[in-house]
């Protein structure tokens, strides 16, 4: 258990912005930070990075105060029931010669963010984030397999209290992970082929994150991240015309504006520069509409001759980091196909779930992903479990192969606390909600080969 308090003081002048963090919240400490931020703003003006941008371009004062409170139906400060639940989960499987390791855990993070501009309260937001975790590893005849329920990237993360645990439905997850791991250790390896690929929502989380979310970050497109996190195959001239995916692909920035996503992991009322968070489409039936860029990044793009729209995604990981363009809740709209429809549509292919490994180039284009669990499908029927399934592709063409999108019965609201970006590094919470999806003519292989 840890606590942290502090403030990030921002100074804005014409053609310049400066940030200075302090844990000293006394008037003297805040004044010292303000003086430092102002000096840095003068330095950035001399770099020309914000040339021709006025104070209002850089930071516009909102006309209202934004408030957010994680929607919690019932929560108690008594954590004994949570501890009892975790202990019961840990005791749900018995130690055997095959069981190598197991773990079950739950992390709760409570935070409050306030924004003041020119002495006026702009935003007061309170969040409760829950992050459960379950893993079991077995070794059978020299073959080791690990199964996460909650996933390698903890995709069950949501906002909420006791109600969030009920929505996650994780009771019995450790026993399920143990059973899956045993079955995987005895299963054949994934076949090497080109064929249909069905991705379940917890793997769609990683696919969305790496090959839609990161490439669309506007500061990356502007070149800010090339020294650390890389660039993007997306360029400013693509917005409004480029066909990013098939007509089945609609992707939106959703800061929790719908009942289904109200408790998604990165829901909020405004970003950390005071911009109102609104539901906006990023990709509309395959066509690239707008980037993942905050107001300041959009103004910089305008000065280059590209009048792109912005979303409220200027986010900081904490009081000691400046806001930068980040993913928040990046979601794919459901389609009309049931899970049975998806399976029946496949002549030969593999269904994959739960990411275990990932690799993608620094322009977020060529990628390779490995999953924990796969099912081979032939003639519209599931044939059986396969282990070490993997697939590879190219973002610029992969989403064009999207041929079917699952309906709301296949839709899951997920999230991860593990998005890293920025110098110095910032770890951000992001949400990804998606149905199951089918892709055609994908290169499939065994990651153990």
PLM regions and their residue ranges:
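Extracytoplasmic assembly/pore-lining segments of large envelope/extracellular complexes
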Residues: 198-210, 275
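Extended amphipathic alpha-helical scaffolds
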Residues: 80-165, 200, 219-252
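N-terminal alpha-helical targeting/anchoring segments
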Residues: 1-42
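Structured beta-strand/loop patches that form or line metal/cofactor-binding pockets in enzymes
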Residues: 1-7, 99-123, 344-370
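Acidic low-complexity segments
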Residues: 32-125, 160-202, 341
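Dual-mode signal for accessory low-complexity, basic/Gly-rich regions
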Residues: 29, 227-230, 234-449
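Short acidic, glycine/serine/threonine-rich loops at helix termini
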Residues: 110-128, 144-152, 207-213, 262-266, ...
């Amino acid at each position: 258990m840890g606590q942290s308090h502090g403030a990030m003081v921002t100074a804005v002048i014409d053609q310049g912005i400066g940030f200075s963090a302090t844990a000293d919240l006394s008037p003297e400490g805040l004044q010292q930070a303000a003086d430092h931020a102002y000096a840095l703003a003068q330095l950035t003006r001399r770099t020309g990075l914000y040339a021709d941008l006025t104070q209002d371009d850089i930071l516009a004062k909102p006309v209202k105060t934004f408030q957010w409170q994680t929607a919690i139906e019932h929560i108690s400060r008594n954590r004994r029931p949570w501890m009892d639940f975790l202990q019961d989960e840990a005791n749900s499987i018995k130690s055997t010669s095959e069981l190598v390791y197991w773990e079950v855990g739950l992390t709760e993070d409570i935070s409050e963010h306030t924004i003041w501009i020119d002495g006026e309260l702009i935003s007061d937001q309170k969040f409760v984030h829950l992050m459960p975790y379950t893993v079991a590893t077995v070794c059978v005849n020299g073959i080791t397999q690990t199964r996460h329920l909650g996933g390698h990237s903890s995709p069950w993360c949501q906002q909420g209290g006791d109600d969030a645990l009920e929505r996650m439905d994780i009771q019995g997850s450790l026993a399920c992970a143990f059973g899956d791991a045993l079955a995987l250790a005895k299963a054949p390896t994934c076949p090497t082929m080109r064929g249909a690929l069905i991705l379940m929502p917890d793997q769609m989380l990683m696919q969305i994150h790496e090959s839609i979310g990161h490439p669309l970050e506007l500061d990356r497109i502007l070149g800010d991240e090339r020294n650390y996190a890389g660039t993007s195959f997306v360029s400013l001239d693509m917005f409004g015309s480029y066909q990013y995916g098939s007509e089945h692909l609609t992707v939106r920035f959703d800061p929790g504006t719908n009942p289904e996503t109200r408790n998604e992991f990165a829901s909020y009322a405004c970003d950390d520069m005071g911009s109102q968070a609104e539901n906006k489409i990023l990709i509309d039936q395959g066509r690239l509409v707008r980037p993942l860029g905050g107001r300041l990044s959009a103004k910089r793009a305008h000065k280059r001759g590209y009048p792109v729209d912005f979303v409220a995604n200027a986010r900081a990981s904490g009081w000691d980091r400046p806001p930068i363009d980040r993913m928040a809740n990046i979601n794919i709209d459901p389609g009309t196909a049931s899970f049975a429809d998806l399976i029946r549509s496949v002549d030969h292919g593999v269904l994959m779930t739960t990411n275990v490994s990932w690799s993608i180039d620094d322009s977020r284009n060529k990628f390779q992903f490995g999953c924990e669990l796969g099912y081979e499908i032939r003639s519209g029927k599931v044939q059986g479990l396969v282990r070490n399934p993997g697939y590879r592709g190219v973002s610029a063409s992969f989403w064009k192969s999207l041929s079917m999108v699952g309906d709301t019965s296949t839709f899951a609201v997920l999230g991860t606390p593990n998005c890293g970006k920025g110098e110095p590094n910032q770890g951000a919470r992001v949400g990804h909600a998606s149905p199951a999806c089918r892709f055609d003519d994908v290169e499939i292989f065994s990651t153990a080969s």
